């Protein structure tokens, strides 16, 4: 892939980036907002919230974006962790709730980012969990280099049994995405379908990129908005990595990646192919403009 990108003038050389904006001078109120889009998963959301509240860094908030409308029972579970709820604890990070009747993950992430009181966005899927030191380790990477515009972690794969028990799938090693090297990771990204988890981004960088896509691609149906964001950010900033597992992906029968039909697989593949095509076109224009200078 790297050699092909060089042939078509879409290769991004090490250390070559687009000009990017300076971060805002005013420091936000909090250090991180963990934003969780969710729809009709009342049996999972409590575990996800508790993994946020168990972080070693407590200067954070949890924003839950329920996208199934008020009839979605997930919202009532979230309210238990808010002021007046039976699981509310004033000593733990705040839980904020937004209820939408539009099932659009990109829209949820964009609204959550705009509501954020924090410096960084941290990704968490509603059926997954953060390790207790996830935010702490991510922040250390950001602090190591001001040119880093995104940090991506590594994750373990767990399984939720029929009895509700969560079990680590030890036959699957920690997923580190080793192809994401400092020199060539952003070129390698065009040949793979994912970059790793969790994904953490300064809020001002999300705004600079024009926010997450909201099913703009004709093939995208709540799929690939994060992949597109990684590709865009990698053109402007270094991507930092946490190689230790700081995230737990939970497999279960109701997961969006579980036993999906071939038509959905094909549509998702087409969506990411379109995103790759757009990335290649942007890179070609960027490289041509650089040569003119």
Placement of each model-derived feature along the sequence:
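Short aromatic/hydrophobic "clamp" motif used to bind/position activated sugar donors
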Residues: 121
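Catalytic beta-strand/loop signature of glycosyltransferases that borders the donor
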Residues: 154, 240-246
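Glycine-rich, basic loop-to-helix element that forms the pyrophosphate-binding segment
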Residues: 100-116
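Acidic donor-binding segment of Leloir-type glycosyltransferases
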Residues: 53-99
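Acidic donor-binding loop at a coil-to-helix junction in glycosyltransferase catalytic cores
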Residues: 219-229
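Conserved donor NDP-sugar-binding/catalytic core segment of glycosyltransferases
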Residues: 133-171
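N-proximal low-complexity "stem/linker" segments adjacent to membrane-targeting elements
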Residues: 1-51
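Short, flexible, basic/aromatic active-site loop/helix in glycosyltransferases
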Residues: 170-191
């Amino acid at each position: 892939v790297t050699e092909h990108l060089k042939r078509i003038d879409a290769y991004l050389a090490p250390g070559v980036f687009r000009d990017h904006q300076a971060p805002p001078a005013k420091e936000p109120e909090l250090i991180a907002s963990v934003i969780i889009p969710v729809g009709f998963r009342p049996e999972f959301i409590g575990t996800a919230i508790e993994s946020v509240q168990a972080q070693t860094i407590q200067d954070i908030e949890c924003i839950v974006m329920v996208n199934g409308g008020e009839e979605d029972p997930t919202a009532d579970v979230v309210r238990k962790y808010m002021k007046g709820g039976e699981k509310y604890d004033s000593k733990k990070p705040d839980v904020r709730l937004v209820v939408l009747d539009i099932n659009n993950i990109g829209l949820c992430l964009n609204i959550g980012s705009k509501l954020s009181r924090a410096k960084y966005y941290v990704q968490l899927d509603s059926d997954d969990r953060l390790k207790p030191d996830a935010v702490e380790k991510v922040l250390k990477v950001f602090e190591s280099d001001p040119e880093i515009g995104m940090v991506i972690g590594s994750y373990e794969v767990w399984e939720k049994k029929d009895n509700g028990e969560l079990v680590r799938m030890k036959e699957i090693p920690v997923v580190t995405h080793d192809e994401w090297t400092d020199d060539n990771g952003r070129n390698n990204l065009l040949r793979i379908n994912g970059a790793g988890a969790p994904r953490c981004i300064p809020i001002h960088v999300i705004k600079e990129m024009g926010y997450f896509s909201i099913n703009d691609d004709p093939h995208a149906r709540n799929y690939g908005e994060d992949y597109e964001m990684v590709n865009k950010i990698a053109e402007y900033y270094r991507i930092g990595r946490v190689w230790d597992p700081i995230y737990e992906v939970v497999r279960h029968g109701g997961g969006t990646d579980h036993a999906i039909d071939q038509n959905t697989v094909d549509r998702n593949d087409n969506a990411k192919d379109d995103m790759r095509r757009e990335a290649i076109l942007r890179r070609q224009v960027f490289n041509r403009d650089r040569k003119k200078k």
